[in-house]
From Swiss-Prot:
EC number(s) given by UniProt: 2.4.2.41
Subcellular location: Golgi apparatus membrane
Induction line: Up-regulated by biotic and abiotic stresses and senescence. Down-regulated by cytokinin and nematodes or Agrobacterium infection.
Ranges of the Lumenal topological domain: 31-500
Segments for region (Disordered): 62-110
Protein name: Xylogalacturonan beta-1,3-xylosyltransferase
Gene source species: Arabidopsis thaliana (Mouse-ear cress)
Taxonomic placement: Eukaryota, Viridiplantae, Streptophyta, Embryophyta, Tracheophyta
Family: Belongs to the glycosyltransferase 47 family.
InterPro entries: Exostosin (IPR004263), Exostosin_GT47 (IPR040911)
Length: 500
């Protein structure tokens, strides 16, 4: 039965009144919504990626906000037009009008928060290290001429200890990869590889990265010495000395890791390195110079006339490692018992030694030069009795003599051309060694006799101080030769900026 007319009117009025109240409430809610409250603000830790899509058109607009950006404004503010583009559509003109006057519904936006990339973190970390080193360099807290900038070096080493991570590629099989000689004059190659590649109480390095994305640099564990031994020998013809097989092996390895991982292509090899003391090691890049243009070679044979690049490559010391030992004997003899002015004993390898022998072989009691020691004369003990130890280049510029002299407390006399000395980024070689060009070999005695006693005693003291940087420890210790090699790599990485 139909309701009375008066009752229907009352219901209509009540319904109209309710609708009016609802509209007023909605209007108040929209008008009181804060206009400037940040939507998200993770400026210190994250980059923000926001995707807004139309439910009908399925269009997507991505906007990234880097950590230096201001706080994000509400998505519906008109002043965000240039930053965030929102797409929506409807078949109703009323809906179009409503969309122009209110924020998009929460269901129309997708918010994705992503952490900064691994490279961003690494570059940020390196920037902090650079700032700390620069600050330390300006304070000059250290007083010493052993280093070019003592404060900068010590701060840099501290930053390296706290931050530096190295990833060793796992690709490749022994004996050509992940293994190297640990004795004799090429031994530093295998010792370094063992430190960075092998797990164990004596080899687990603090610098090894747990994951490649956390690494600052990447070590290619390629043994030139093992390639020569297993791939080349025996060499029975002149053609057997061709470097083609060596080139093919290293280039194929780089192709594998560059295809499998993003890191080589990201830096064009600028944060990748190898270490070798073999005479052929400098030649690894000659097969494809463009590919290895930025690649870091850690070389004993650091000859600038044969392609060594001091601003890219790293000069490492050649250390003779007797079997079962980590270096020559220590001979800290007092200057008072050093009666020999200068000493050298060794084979006539290379042109420089031929010139040395021509002028000094067994010709002087103060400058004692031998190709073979006389009976009853001990090599190590004679170094310990000498003030200066002659270190002429042999077939190559590098020689174990420099390190042997330092171990013996004997001031090194470096006779070479085009030799980029180890760790010369930080060490002031002039403070603890004498450098004589090949053209002045005949003047050796005059030059050394002109060194005053005061200067000699200072140099002797610094030889004892610098020795710690040429000592091989397993596991490695701060400031030893292993850490100095890594520090040279660390400096190259500090000079490289990626992703900027």
């Amino acid at each position: 039965m139909a309701a009375p007319r008066s009752r229907r009117c009352s219901l209509s009025l009540l319904t109209l009144f309710s609708i009016t109240l609802i509209l007023i409430s909605v209007s108040l809610f929209v008008s009181t919504k804060p206009a400037n409250k940040p939507f998200l603000d993770y400026r210190n830790q994250f980059s923000i990626s926001i995707s807004i899509s139309s439910p009908l058109e399925q269009n997507t607009t991505n906007t990234s906000f880097v950590s230096a950006s201001p706080p994000l404004s509400p998505l519906g503010q008109s002043n965000t037009t240039n930053t965030i583009l929102a797409s929506s559509s409807s078949s109703s003109s009323f809906s179009d009008h409503q969309n122009q006057n209110k924020s998009p519904s929460p269901t129309s936006k997708k918010i994705v928060i992503r952490k900064r990339s691994g490279l961003d973190k690494i570059e940020s970390d390196l920037a902090k290290a650079r700032a700390a080193i620069k600050k330390a360099a300006s304070t000059q807290n250290y007083v010493s001429s052993l280093y070019k900038n003592p404060a900068a070096f010590h701060q840099s080493h501290t930053e390296m200890m706290n931050r530096f991570k190295v990833w060793t590629y796992t690709e490749g099989e022994v004996p050509l990869f992940h293994d190297g000689p640990v004795n004799d004059i090429y031994g530093i190659e295998g010792q370094f590889m063992d430190e960075m590649c092998v797990d164990g109480p004596k080899s687990r390095s603090r610098f090894r990265a747990d994951r490649p994305e956390n690494a600052h640099v990447f070590f290619i564990p390629f043994s030139v010495a093992k390639v020569i031994h297993f791939v080349y020998k025996p060499i029975t013809s002149v053609e057997g000395f061709s470097r083609a097989r060596l080139h093919r092996l290293i280039e194929d390895y780089v192709d594998v890791v560059a295809t499998k991982h993003p890191y080589w292509n990201r830096s064009q090899g600028g944060d990748h390195f190898m270490v070798s003391c073999h005479d052929w090691a400098p030649d690894v890049i000659d097969g494809n110079p463009k590919l290895f243009e930025k690649f870091i070679r850690g070389l004993c044979n650091a000859n600038t006339s044969e392609g060594f690049r001091p601003n890219v490559d790293v000069s490492i010391p050649e250390i003779y490692l007797p079997k079962g030992k980590l270096g020559p004997s220590f001979l800290g003899k007092s200057p008072r018992v050093r009666s020999i002015l200068a000493f050298f004993a060794g084979r006539s390898h290379g042109e420089i030694r031929k010139i040395l022998f021509q002028h000094w072989k067994e010709m002087d009691n103060e400058v004692q030069v031998y190709d073979r020691l006389p009976p009853g004369k001990d090599y190590t003990k004679t170094m310990g009795m000498s003030k200066f130890c002659l270190c002429p280049s042999g077939w190559e510029v590098a020689s174990p003599r420099e390190v042997e002299a330092i171990y013996a407390g004997c001031v090194p006399v470096i006779i070479s051309d085009n030799y980029s000395l180890p760790f010369s980024d930080v060490l002031n070689w002039d403070s603890f060694s004498i450098q004589i060009p090949v053209s002045r070999i005949k003047e050796i005695k005059t030059i050394l006799q002109s060194v005053s006693l005061v200067r000699y005693l200072k140099m002797y003291k610094r030889v004892l101080e610098v020795k710690q940087h040429f000592v091989l420890n397993r596991p490695a210790k701060p400031y030893d030769v292993m850490h100095m090699m890594l520090h040279s790599i660390w400096l190259r990485r500090l000079n490289l900026r990626l992703g900027t």
